[in-house]
Amino acid sequence: MCIRDSNIINGYWNISDNLPMHLCSVSNLIACFILFIPKNNRLFEFLYYAGIIGAFQAFFTPQINNFDGTNYEYLEYYLSHGGIMLLPIYMLKNLGYKLTKYSWLKVVIYLNILLAIVMPLNFIIDSNYMYLAYAPNVSNPLIIGDWPYYILFWEIIIVILTYILYVISTGKRI
């Protein structure tokens, strides 16, 4: 689901909450377009690591905002996150995409570049994209400490998870 128009229709849309600046929103946008553009391994690698790890985390610690009492929000949330997780696996197994030797480390660098863009934006527009302004309002055992310490902890977790995903996916170690 490329565009979350339900927030526009039901009047919940605002710049502080609905720009596609959360990690899964960025991954979702990439997932919508990656199959329609010439083979781009950088986008694939970003989608593979950030999409799978981000969506996996979202499945286990969901935060569904603006729940309007219908099942649409739940369906949209879980179907979009499921698609973010399954598409890069399908691309790896069936479409000839490959993970390069240091792809896991490159994606960590890309994520930090994205962090450097999103963090100041959060303070400018009073938002919490990528949960960089304050911790998400969910029960998450991996949120350790207050801001900014939980972000530093997540930096370590992301490096470990991307490397583990690389080893599992390729069978290679570095």
Predicted regions and their residues:
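Conserved small/polar residues in nucleotide/adenosyl-binding loops
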Residues: 1-5
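Membrane-interface helix caps and helix-loop-helix hairpins in membrane proteins
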Residues: 8-17, 37-41, 63-75
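Structural signature of hydrophobic alpha-helical transmembrane segments
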Residues: 12-24, 47-48
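Hydrophobic cores of alpha-helical transmembrane segments in multi-pass inner/ER membrane proteins
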Residues: 24-36, 80-94, 151-166
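Membrane-interface helix-boundary motifs at transmembrane edges
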Residues: 36-44, 94-105, 172-174
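Central hydrophobic cores of alpha-helical transmembrane segments
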Residues: 46-54, 105-114
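A contiguous pocket-lining binding segment that forms or flanks enzyme active sites
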Residues: 62-110
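Membrane-interface transmembrane-helix boundary segments in multi-pass integral membrane proteins
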Residues: 106-113, 123-162
